[in-house]
């Protein structure tokens, strides 16, 4: 071998020795990147799985709340209905007891008494659920009273209710039915 060839081989060997640590570093760095990529991929898959589970839980909760809301609306008047049952019982008892009473004066008095008690029971049940009668002692209010007539009156101030033809009712603050009244001029 010639001197030139020896020098060339030595320089190649030296270059290879110099490149080998760099190649090893590059390979190690590439392996580290691949490992980090694998870890990140696993974490991504785990997070996707968690997201899918949370989303499914959310949808289930949403459906359950919708069913509960529907049920609550469907049975919202259950307490009210239960409070009306005793009133119905009282009316049935009044009808059934009227056939056993022989004396007509006594019959009318007992029937009147039964109707008054039933009316009181009904008023109490309605008030318990926020349904009240519109006041007739207060000044005329177009939100809860319907003036069907106005009359001149010396005994009642102008704007006051003179007579009530039909009782009005409110549910809490909302009118259910306006009272039909006569108002003083």
Swiss-Prot record:
Signal peptide: none annotated. Transmembrane segments: none annotated. Keywords: Chaperone, Cytoplasm, Stress response. GO terms for cellular component: cytosol. One of its GO terms (molecular function) is unfolded protein binding. CDD domains: GrpE. The keyword Transmembrane helix does not apply. InterPro entries: GrpE, GrpE_coiled_coil, GrpE_head. The keyword Transport does not apply. Disulfide bonds: none annotated. Residues 1-20 have a biased composition (Basic and acidic residues). It is found in: Cytoplasm. GO terms for biological process: protein folding. Its main location: cytoplasm. Residues 1-28 are annotated as: Disordered. Participates actively in the response to hyperosmotic and heat shock by preventing the aggregation of stress-denatured proteins, in association with DnaK and GrpE. It is the nucleotide exchange factor for DnaK and may function as a thermosensor. Unfolded proteins bind initially to DnaJ; upon interaction with the DnaJ-bound protein, DnaK hydrolyzes its bound ATP, resulting in the formation of a stable complex. GrpE releases ADP from DnaK; ATP binding to DnaK triggers the release of the substrate protein, thus completing the reaction cycle. Belongs to the GrpE family. Homodimer. This is Protein GrpE.
